[in-house]
């Protein structure tokens, strides 16, 4: 009886040792929040704005029908015409990610990543380091049918009691061969703060 109780106690002790929680480091006033929750900390551009823009543009572009057949798209940097620092690359990355998840489009190396692609091809083909049967051949990259480009601008109005910020995000899909804008949309966001 004592041996059976000792074995059960040992198993319970071992099991409780395996269920250790990870240590938490840092301040006590920090907590995780819902990444999709509306963020109203300031009237500057924030995560909620980024998510609203990306979701709105992705939905509009996917529903337009222009991307039938999963064409290749090259994404250009969105021009930041605001007085704030806004990482516009995060907006286009979110749009690309959502379109990739839906299977609506394929993406060529964008204008900022193109040099990395060229460097990798040169390294494989000119360095002599790689087995020739595994080397990616030059001249086989797929050209984009469309380019996606846009801008974000803002108008800021202040009084002694209020600050009003109006953002306008514009995005367009251009047919590379014809130069025609095949799709265009914009998302407007207004944020007002009372002092």
Q: Where are the language model's segments positioned?
A:
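Bacterial N-terminal signal peptides that target proteins for export
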Residues: 1-7
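Acidic/histidine-rich, surface-exposed loop or edge segments in extracytoplasmic proteins
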Residues: 31-45, 71-81
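Amphipathic beta-strand/beta-sheet edge segments enriched in Tyr/Trp
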Residues: 19-26, 145-193
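Alpha-helix termination/capping residues and helix-transition junctions
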Residues: 12-15, 67, 141
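Extracytoplasmic/periplasmic, Sec-exported soluble proteins
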Residues: 42-53, 65, 83-87, 91, ...
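Bacterial Sec signal peptide processing site at the extreme N-terminus
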Residues: 12-40, 194-195
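A short, hydrophobic beta-strand-centered structural micro-motif
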Residues: 56-57, 73-77, 127-159
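N-terminal segment of the mature soluble domain
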Residues: 52-55, 60-130, 178-184
């Amino acid at each position: 009886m004592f041996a059976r109780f000792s074995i059960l106690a040992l198993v319970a002790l071992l099991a409780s040792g395996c269920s250790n929680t990870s240590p938490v480091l840092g301040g006590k006033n920090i907590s995780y929040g819902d990444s999709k929750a509306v963020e109203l900390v300031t009237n500057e551009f924030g995560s909620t704005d980024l998510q609203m823009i990306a979701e709105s543009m992705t939905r509009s572009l996917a529903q337009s029908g222009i991307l039938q057949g999963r064409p290749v798209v090259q994404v250009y940097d969105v021009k930041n015409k605001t007085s704030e620092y806004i990482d516009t690359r995060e907006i286009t990355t979110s749009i690309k990610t959502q379109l990739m998840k839906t299977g609506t489009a394929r993406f060529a190396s964008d204008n900022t990543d193109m040099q990395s692609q060229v460097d990798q091809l040169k390294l494989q083909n000119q360095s002599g380091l790689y087995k020739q049967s595994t080397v990616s051949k030059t001249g086989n990259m797929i050209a984009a049918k469309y380019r996606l480009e846009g801008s974000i601008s803002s108008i800021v109005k202040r009084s002694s009691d209020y600050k009003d910020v109006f953002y306008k995000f514009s995005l367009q899909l251009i047919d590379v061969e014809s130069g025609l804008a095949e799709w265009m949309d914009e998302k407007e966001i207004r944020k007002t703060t009372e002092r």
